[in-house]
């Protein structure tokens, strides 16, 4: 009986973890264009930020801040490919200033926003 209870607990615990991960990802998807950080996510989830930080990292391999920045860079790339100017899009993508946008974009793409736009506009 104790083995059955342990297995049931593990199944429920796993599904609870998956539910939390999906909720975190959904919340980030809906809010990454504003000044979003782990404190906001934890507050929204009514969970301890250390817990969600460990859970998210163990389930996705990424920290929440990396996930948010990757999503922001993905949006920035799409806007640049659509012909928008880098100076005009950083705020739309959730960055508070151009310097941070530039640094994060370059970190994830190995090129500046302008280089990315130039490279991909010739395709």
Task: Annotate each language-model stretch with its function.
Residues 1-26, 30, 39-45, 58-66, ...:
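Short, Lys/Arg-enriched, Trp-marked, Pro/Gly-tolerant hinge/linker segments that flank
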Residues 26, 30, 35, 58-96, ...:
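Terminal helix-turn-helix DNA-binding modules in bacterial transcription factors
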Residues 39, 50, 85-88, 99, ...:
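Residues within helix-turn-helix
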Residues 51-52, 56, 100-101, 105:
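Short hydrophobic/aromatic patch on the recognition helix
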Residues 103-123:
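…primarily DNA-binding HTH/wHTH and HhH modules…
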């Amino acid at each position: 009986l104790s083995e059955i209870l342990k297995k049931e607990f593990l199944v429920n615990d796993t599904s609870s973890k998956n539910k939390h991960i999906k909720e975190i990802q959904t919340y980030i998807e809906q809010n990454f264009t504003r000044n979003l950080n782990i404190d906001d996510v934890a507050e929204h989830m009514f969970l301890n930020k250390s817990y969600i930080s460990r859970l998210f990292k163990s389930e996705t391999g990424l920290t929440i801040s990396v996930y948010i920045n990757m999503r922001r860079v993905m949006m920035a790339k799409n806007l640049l490919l659509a012909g928008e100017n880098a100076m005009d899009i950083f705020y739309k993508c959730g960055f508070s200033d151009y310097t941070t946008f530039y640094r994060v974009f370059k970190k994830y793409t190995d090129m500046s926003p302008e280089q990315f736009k130039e490279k991909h506009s010739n395709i």
